[in-house]
Amino acid sequence: MALCALTSALRSLSLASAAITARVPTLLPAAQIQSNVLLQLPPALVSPSYRPVHMSADRSAKFVSWKSRTKYTVKPVKMRKSGGRDHTGRIRVHGIGGGHKQNYRMIDFLRFRPEKEKAPEPFEEKVVVVRYDPCRSADIALVAGGSRKRWIIATENMKAGDTILNSNHIGRMAVAAQEGDAHPLGALPVGTLINNVESEPGRGAQYIRAAGTCGVLLRKVNGTAIIQLPSKRQMQVLESCTATVGRVSNVNHNQRVIGKAGRNRWLGKRPNSGLWQRKGGWAGRKIRPLPPMKSYVKLPSAAAQN
């Protein structure tokens, strides 16, 4: 009697489990479900055998869309934040994230850029407006000349209504340049305060572009110019490289008071870990010689001269 009761209980348990399995959707692959005769489920309940994955090419296409613009425009361009991630989606910089929405304004760092229809000769432009730029520490200025407008880095005392000169001429005598004018280094007198300096002629400004910074034209030697950077390091470039006269705008940028941690989050800066680190030999000031002069002049080697 006990054996018959146990057999009937097991038979009822197996039938109940089969009924429950038929009612509940399964997560088995589609090929295995179709081969099983006992489970006849509708196609809508059959789960696919893979999960769609976003490829890195799709991410990179969306990530650099606002950077890959080839046509210049003075209109603000919508900017996509990276969050410290590269094109694969992995975090590369942990201190970047969040922040207020920003629009990118294309800055023309090549000051001497004559229009296509005109000959390459000095030309003047008028400052339309000087405004704040969320993507950099310095202020920017909208200048107009001829049939075009463009954004440039504003100097310290630049204001709307000013007229600036852009030249590529190097004369026998040094010019009496005004603040905001752009001239080759060979045309400026020694001791001039400069900013937005080119490393190679026609490449565009690459040095001294931060707010409140300026360099000094120390001397001119054999067709080259020696410049002192804000870090006190000296740099040698060709005298045909263009520079802007004066000091970069927003001089009090380094004296601003953040006031609270939330303002850094507005700027897109994430908090640090807060881990205490013992101050070792890397901390504090040290007496060390200045680094050697950086040269962008490709002089012929001694072997080539011999």
From Swiss-Prot:
SUPFAM superfamilies: Nucleic acid-binding proteins (SSF50249), Translation proteins SH3-like domain (SSF50104). The keyword Cytoplasm does not apply. GO terms for molecular function: structural constituent of ribosome. The keyword Mitochondrion applies. Disulfide bonds: none annotated. Its main location: mitochondrion. InterPro entries: NA-bd_OB-fold, Rib_uL2_dom2, Ribosomal_uL2, Ribosomal_uL2_C, Ribosomal_uL2_RNA-bd_dom, Translation_prot_SH3-like_sf. GO terms for cellular component: mitochondrial inner membrane; mitochondrial large ribosomal subunit; mitochondrion; nucleoplasm. Keywords: Mitochondrion, Ribonucleoprotein, Ribosomal protein, Transit peptide. GO terms for biological process: mitochondrial translation; translation. Gene3D superfamilies: 2.30.30.30, Nucleic acid-binding proteins. It comes from the Eukaryota. It is found in: Mitochondrion. Residues 1-60 form a transit peptide. SMART domains: Ribosomal_L2, Ribosomal_L2_C. Pfam families: Ribosomal_L2 (PF00181), Ribosomal_L2_C (PF03947). Belongs to the universal ribosomal protein uL2 family. Component of the mitochondrial ribosome large subunit (39S) which comprises a 16S rRNA and about 50 distinct proteins. This is Large ribosomal subunit protein uL2m. It comes from Mus musculus. The lineage of its organism: Eukaryota, Metazoa, Chordata, Craniata, Vertebrata.
